[in-house]
């Protein structure tokens, strides 16, 4: 997070508030829309945790102070008009008071573009189950059993992918590949490998390498 941000550049409304969009820094998922004033922004920068201003209670509040669902701030940006801020966070639990991961869990409209975020969203959910286990949840069960159980499942799913491909059954293959990808994401979380790490490796292999070959 940039500590040298100048709050004076921000355009607060007549009540001294500015809308703050909170976004997961890894998955890109929008978690909530809240409001900040100069004091809450200052406390956010000083503590590396999100602080907002409650319009209803007319006081500052720290996300996770009661629930434990803290948000560690990675970056704060402001838009071209300086009248809204974007807060990138590492969320330690659900953002919504309902228990949902994001406050934006009701869809007004959706098209295929939304599918682009499904893998980061699944990865974020897996991370949440790892850091905050839920009794009876399959993902939490895998983490509880450890790496040997996860590797066993990956081996089983890989075998089922091979069988589905040999059977030339597209629907079955799609299903088995989805299972393999899910368990691979679980292993990544267990081993501390992020989607960003994978993207960087693929970039080195397919973009940088291609550029070097052209030189």
From Swiss-Prot:
The record's top EC class is: hydrolase
Stored SUPFAM superfamilies: all-alpha NTP pyrophosphatases, HisI-like
Q: Which reaction does it catalyse?
A: 1-(5-phospho-beta-D-ribosyl)-ATP + H2O = 1-(5-phospho-beta-D-ribosyl)-5'-AMP + diphosphate + H(+); 1-(5-phospho-beta-D-ribosyl)-5'-AMP + H2O = 1-(5-phospho-beta-D-ribosyl)-5-[(5-phospho-beta-D-ribosylamino)methylideneamino]imidazole-4-carboxamide
- Keywords of this entry: Amino-acid biosynthesis, ATP-binding, Cytoplasm, Histidine biosynthesis, Hydrolase, Multifunctional enzyme, Nucleotide-binding
Instruction: Give EC number(s), comma-separated.
Output: 3.5.4.19, 3.6.1.31
**Which pathway does UniProt place it in?**
Amino-acid biosynthesis; L-histidine biosynthesis; L-histidine from 5-phospho-alpha-D-ribose 1-diphosphate: step 2/9; Amino-acid biosynthesis; L-histidine biosynthesis; L-histidine from 5-phospho-alpha-D-ribose 1-diphosphate: step 3/9
Q: Which InterPro entries match?
A: His_synth_HisIE, HisE, PRA-CH, PRib-ATP_PPHydrolase-like, PRib_AMP_CycHydrolase_dom, PRib_AMP_CycHydrolase_sf
> What residue spans carry the region label Phosphoribosyl-AMP cyclohydrolase?
1-118
Q: Which Pfam families match?
A: PRA-CH, PRA-PH
Give the subcellular location: Cytoplasm
Any one GO cellular component localisation term in the record: cytoplasm
UniProt GO BP: L-histidine biosynthetic process
Location of region: Phosphoribosyl-ATP pyrophosphohydrolase: 119-215
Q: Which GO terms describe its molecular function?
A: ATP binding; phosphoribosyl-AMP cyclohydrolase activity; phosphoribosyl-ATP diphosphatase activity
Q: Which NCBIfam families did the record assign? A: histidine_hisI, PRK00051.1, PRK02759.1
Q: Which family does it belong to?
A: In the N-terminal section; belongs to the PRA-CH family.
Q: State what protein this is by name.
A: Histidine biosynthesis bifunctional protein HisIE
Organism encoding this protein: Oceanobacillus iheyensis (strain DSM 14371 / CIP 107618 / JCM 11309 / KCTC 3954 / HTE831)
Its ancestry begins with: Bacteria, Bacillati, Bacillota, Bacilli, Bacillales
């Amino acid at each position: 997070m940039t500590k040298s941000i100048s709050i004076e550049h921000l355009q607060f409304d007549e009540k001294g508030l500015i809308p703050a969009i909170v976004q997961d820094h890894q998955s890109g998922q929008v978690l909530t829309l809240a409001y900040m004033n100069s004091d809450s922004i200052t406390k956010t920068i000083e503590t590396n945790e999100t602080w907002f201003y409650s319009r209803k209670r007319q006081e500052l509040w720290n996300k996770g102070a009661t629930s434990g669902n803290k948000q560690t701030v990675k970056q704060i940006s402001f838009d071209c008009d300086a009248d809204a801020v974007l807060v990138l966070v590492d969320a330690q639990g659900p953002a919504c008071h309902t228990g949902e991961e994001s406050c934006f869990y009701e869809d007004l409209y959706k098209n295929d573009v939304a599918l682009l975020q499904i893998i980061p969203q699944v990865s974020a959910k897996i991370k949440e189950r790892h850091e905050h286990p839920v009794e009876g949840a399959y993902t939490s069960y895998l983490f509880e059993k450890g790496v040997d159980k996860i590797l066993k499942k990956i081996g089983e799913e890989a075998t089922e992918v091979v069988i589905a491909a040999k059977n030339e059954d597209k629907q079955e293959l799609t299903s088995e590949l989805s299972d393999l990808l899910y368990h691979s994401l679980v292993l990544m979380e267990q081993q501390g490998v992020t989607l960003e790490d994978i993207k960087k490796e693929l970039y080195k292999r397919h973009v940088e390498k291609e550029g070097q070959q052209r030189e």
